[in-house]
């Protein structure tokens, strides 16, 4: 059992006590043990964090872009040096397998910081002549203070995804991690400070989203909100941001993504991709391809191939090197996923494997749900329509391309989509018809720093990562210059 000291807030370059006098517990989902008590920020603490950010941002923005770039690159070096230490803490807090957090979470998050550190010096405006005596130019200026609100499935990675472009562009960020997985955001803040980021440029406030999130979205000093989470909460955040001071928003929300297997696909490759698209990170990935469309002629063979692979999944202690499937991140979430599984059974889906909680030995103490595969699924089933955010695959048979495209697009979500086919032209044709912002052909799930990430429809607004994101952390100032005489009409 690991017990950490009481976790504080991080404001103006140091850990500080919250003034609310309240705390909440963060729990190890593999064991049910309490890891730490975490202090809850009061509204006065949030105000202190915002004012600190406003002060720090002026110092940060006054630095040259090259100075900011060097500091962010130093943060990357520290992140990579402490990869294993941070991964251990992330596994403790989230339940994700250590084999995953050591190779993905910190590594890919640091990649994003490194990517934007390189772009910090490339933020530029334009200059155009209007006539011989006049021209105009544009400047891209930082927004000022922005807020990031993180989700519980990739805590430190999301904190880096949100802070990296914001800081590279000269902004300061007040970040609120999920209260389910609150531990690593403060470690990131300390690393930024150690690297040379001025006090106040990255502050961390803890507590329930319904309070802290509202205070951030309504604060008049904050110019932008970057939110990752569910659709219903995202709509509230967006409405609050608009009604308070017309803040800009980036929303990375939910998904119910289709994975289309074509009849010419290699069966083994298709099954491998489907299993990765559903069970990586115990199924807790917003882009997961949980609606797997399979040609009716391939259905039996595909089902057998998927079940064979699911049986090879190694469920266990997430700290064990051999484990590649840990518990869900919280016990309440486990109960929610189990309710969805029961609804699948009740609505007539055919259970191929899994279908309940893992209760063997020590697993009974944790929030473990067995990798679950349903077939004979219909588009009107609850498990097919709603985001489960857990290890539940729904297999749906189809007969032709037009049908599968229509059914794949028949959703309010539009986050991700994938196609598996040996015919590249066919794969591109189908992908271009699918209504989704992140798409993969003959693979699934990779999100490199260079690739914009975001959804269509109710899956989001704006993008994270990629070159275009950097521009959304700046605003354009246009300046006209007249070198000649000025003639008034009056």
Curated annotation (Swiss-Prot):
Q: Which annotated residues bind K(+) 1?
A: 26, 93, 180
Active site residues of this protein: 162, 252, 286, 464
Entry-linked InterPro entries? Ald_DH/histidinol_DH, Ald_DH_C, Ald_DH_CS_CYS, Ald_DH_CS_GLU, Ald_DH_N, Aldehyde_DH_dom, BADH
Return the EC number: 1.2.1.8
Q: Where does the source fall among the domains of life? A: Bacteria
Specify whether Signal is a keyword of the entry.
no
User: Could you tell me the keywords of this UniProt record?
Assistant: Metal-binding, NAD, NADP, Oxidation, Oxidoreductase, Potassium
Which reaction(s) does the protein catalyse, per the Swiss-Prot or TrEMBL entry? betaine aldehyde + NAD(+) + H2O = glycine betaine + NADH + 2 H(+)
* Family membership noted in the UniProt record: Belongs to the aldehyde dehydrogenase family.
Q: What is this protein called?
A: Betaine aldehyde dehydrogenase
**Species whose genome carries this gene:** Stenotrophomonas maltophilia (strain R551-3)
Its lineage reads:
Bacteria, Pseudomonadati, Pseudomonadota, Gammaproteobacteria, Lysobacterales
Gene this chain is encoded by: betB
């Amino acid at each position: 059992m690991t017990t950490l000291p009481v976790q504080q807030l991080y404001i103006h370059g140091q850990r500080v006590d919250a003034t609310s006098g309240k705390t909440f517990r963060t729990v190890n989902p593999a064991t049910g043990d309490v890891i730490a008590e975490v202090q809850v920020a009061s509204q006065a603490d949030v105000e202190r964090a915002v004012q600190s950010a406003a002060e720090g941002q002026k110092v940060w923005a006054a630095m040259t872009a090259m100075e900011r770039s060097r500091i962010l690159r130093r943060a990357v070096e520290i992140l990579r040096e402490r990869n294993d230490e941070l991964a251990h803490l992330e596994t403790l807090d989230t339940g994700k397998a250590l084999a995953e957090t050591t190779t993905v979470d910190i590594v890919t998050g640091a990649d994003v910081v490194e990517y934007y550190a390189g772009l910090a010096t490339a933020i530029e405006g334009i200059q155009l002549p209007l006539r011989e005596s006049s021209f105009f130019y544009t400047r891209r200026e930082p927004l000022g203070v922005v807020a990031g609100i993180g989700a519980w499935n990739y805590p430190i990675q999301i904190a880096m995804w949100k802070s990296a472009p914001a800081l590279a562009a000269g902004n300061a960020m007040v970040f609120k991690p999920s209260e389910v997985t609150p531990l690593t955001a403060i470690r990131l803040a300390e690393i930024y400070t150690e690297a040379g980021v001025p006090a106040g440029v990255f502050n961390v406030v803890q507590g329930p989203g319904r309070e802290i999130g509202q205070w951030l979205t309504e604060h008049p000093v904050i110019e932008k909100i970057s939110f990752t989470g569910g659709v219903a909460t995202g709509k509230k955040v967006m409405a609050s941001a608009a009604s308070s001071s017309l803040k800009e928003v980036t929303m990375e929300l939910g998904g119910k993504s289709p994975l289309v297997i074509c009849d010419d696909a290699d069966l083994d490759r298709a099954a491998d991709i489907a299993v990765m698209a559903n069970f990586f990170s115990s199924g807790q990935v917003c882009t997961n391809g949980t609606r797997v469309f399979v040609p009716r002629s391939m259905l039996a063979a595909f089902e057998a191939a998927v079940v064979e692979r699911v049986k090879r999944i190694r469920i266990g202690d997430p700290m064990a090197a051999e484990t590649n499937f840990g518990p869900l991140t919280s016990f309440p979430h486990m109960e929610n996923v189990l309710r969805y599984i029961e609804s699948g059974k009740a609505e007539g889906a055919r259970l191929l494997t899994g279908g309940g909680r893992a209760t063997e030995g020590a697993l009974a103490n944790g929030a473990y749900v067995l990798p679950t595969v349903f077939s004979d699924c219909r588009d009107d089933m609850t498990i097919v329509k709603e985001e489960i955010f857990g290890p539940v695959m729904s297999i749906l048979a189809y007969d032709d391309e037009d049908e599968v495209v229509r059914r794949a697009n028949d959703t309010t979500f539009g986050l991700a989509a994938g196609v598996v086919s040996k015919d590249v032209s066919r794969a591109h044709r189908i992908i271009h018809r699918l209504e989704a912002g992140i798409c993969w052909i003959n693979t699934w799930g990779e999100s490199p720093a260079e690739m914009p990430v975001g959804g269509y429809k109710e899956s989001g607004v704006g993008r994270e990562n990629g070159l275009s994101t950097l521009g959304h952390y700046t605003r354009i100032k246009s300046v006209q210059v007249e070198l000649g005489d000025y003639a008034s009409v009056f």
